[in-house]
Amino acid sequence: MKNQDQALIFEVSKEGRIGYSLPKLDVEEVKLEDVFESDYIRVEDAELPEVSELDIMRHYTALSNRNHGVDSGFYPLGSCTMKYNPKINESVARFAGFANIHPLQDEKTVQGAMELMYDLQEHLIEITGMDTVTLQPAAGAHGEWTGLMLIRAYHEANGDFNRTKVIVPDSAHGTNPASATVAGFETITVKSNENGLVDLEDLKRVVNEETAALMLTNPNTLGLFEENILEMAEIVHNAGGKLYYDGANLNAVLSQARPGDMGFDVVHLNLHKTFTGPHGGGGPGSGPVGVKADLIPYLPKPILEKTESGYHFNYDRPEAIGRVKPFYGNFGINVRAYTYIRSMGPDGLRAVTEYAVLNANYMMRRLAPFYDLPFDRHCKHEFVLSGRRQKKLGVRTLDIAKRLLDFGYHPPTIYFPLNVEECIMIEPTETESKETLDGFIDKMIQIAKEVEENPEVVQEAPHTTVIKRLDETMAARKTSFTLCKASSCTSLIRITKEELAEVGSFFVWRICPALTDSKLPTQNLAGAKKPGGR
């Protein structure tokens, strides 16, 4: 079968074909009817594919060959730090003492794992300049939300219930305003100046007695260091607010500068980015949060402590915001990050930043003659170009990204940050060689020349991939299915985008035929009996 003709797993299915022989039942058989109510039991068999083990292996091996990852090629996705993940991390994470333990074990039986967690916290405290760290948050945005909830708890404990606004720059990560909203804050945007930095005058204008915090990435998402950070911290602190550090770009200042020394009160880190946990396929991540002393009482419980008798979790924290994740963080990623930090050492981490910044500036200068450079100044770990010049010739940034696929490269981040027209954001990381950078640069230059000489080649790209382009018009208009979301309902409702926008995704149950008199068509996910009305 040709790769282009890859069948769906359901198309490979043949009735009666068996892929695995289950062993004899060696425990007492339990009937589902004795455990679940009838509403939750299928009345028909699930329509699952019937395939052999060989069918499965060939099918998913073929699909895996279509994937692109750091191990298979250059991955210059801006603001994502797609660096190589050393394989020693995987070896250590698979040690029996780490891989085979259970979070409900007695603390006395997992002292080695707890020691690793404690030491990792100490390393992160030193790296960030914070007073303590919690490893609980699962990833970056979860860390953001946790940090903002700590700030909220701090203000409320001090009687400042009117501090309901969080300020974010117009170049901020999209998760910043999203996390602020989920944490119960209103988001206020502060503008960037002509140099791509936060406009201090605009910051002074928006900061007031309602300000809970200012969220910043430093360097920012344009790859530029916020050189006025100390003055910004003073402005926010004088108004009674807190300064929050989004650690997405820590790779640019690792062992060179510390958020705590810049005036930040809260910081979250992305161990899966800066400290080489595998990412890009959905996780898992790890988003530890560090705080200054006045926020320690509100950290999620438990906190990990070291005493004369060993390591233990302290749950006696009356002012804590509660748990933010079951047990204590994504332990496997924490093991990988600890391994990386110990392998690199202080000098190695310092070199990480030096090479990341060098690689980004080298690429920026080589590409500047062929693409617009919105901010012509020294960058940090990443930089942004603009495809405005190419757009005037009828070629969009999206087309450029698609053309890169023909050469085996994962495209950079495009159309972000939002304050740069036709934005192309590139982050090479420190792990790429000059030869790799030159290969990518040469193709970017080739594409720029194609835009001028033969734009159709770029407009119609990609030409060599299995999948070409999505039908954007159809995708925008076509109806889709969404879950009912009622607690006892398994219906999948077919609904147009317009109908979904009118009702709201969390209130789809109001038009579910299983619960109302609505005439919208549905599919029942479980093939179960539909429950009665609410």
Swiss-Prot record:
Belongs to the GcvP family. C-terminal subunit subfamily. The glycine cleavage system catalyzes the degradation of glycine. The P protein binds the alpha-amino group of glycine through its pyridoxal phosphate cofactor; CO(2) is released and the remaining methylamine moiety is then transferred to the lipoamide cofactor of the H protein. One of its GO terms (biological process) is glycine decarboxylation via glycine cleavage system. GO terms for cellular component: cytosol; glycine cleavage complex. Keywords: Oxidoreductase, Pyridoxal phosphate. Disulfide bonds: none annotated. The glycine cleavage system is composed of four proteins: P, T, L and H. In this organism, the P 'protein' is a heterodimer of two subunits. The modification N6-(pyridoxal phosphate)lysine is found at residue 273. Its EC number is 1.4.4.2. The keyword Oxidoreductase applies. It catalyses: N(6)-[(R)-lipoyl]-L-lysyl-[glycine-cleavage complex H protein] + glycine + H(+) = N(6)-[(R)-S(8)-aminomethyldihydrolipoyl]-L-lysyl-[glycine-cleavage complex H protein] + CO2. HAMAP family: GcvPB. The keyword Oxidoreductase applies. GO terms for molecular function: glycine binding; glycine dehydrogenase (decarboxylating) activity; pyridoxal phosphate binding. Its cofactor is pyridoxal 5'-phosphate. It comes from Bacillus cereus (strain ATCC 14579 / DSM 31 / CCUG 7414 / JCM 2152 / NBRC 15305 / NCIMB 9373 / NCTC 2599 / NRRL B-3711). This is Probable glycine dehydrogenase (decarboxylating) subunit 2. It comes from the Bacteria.
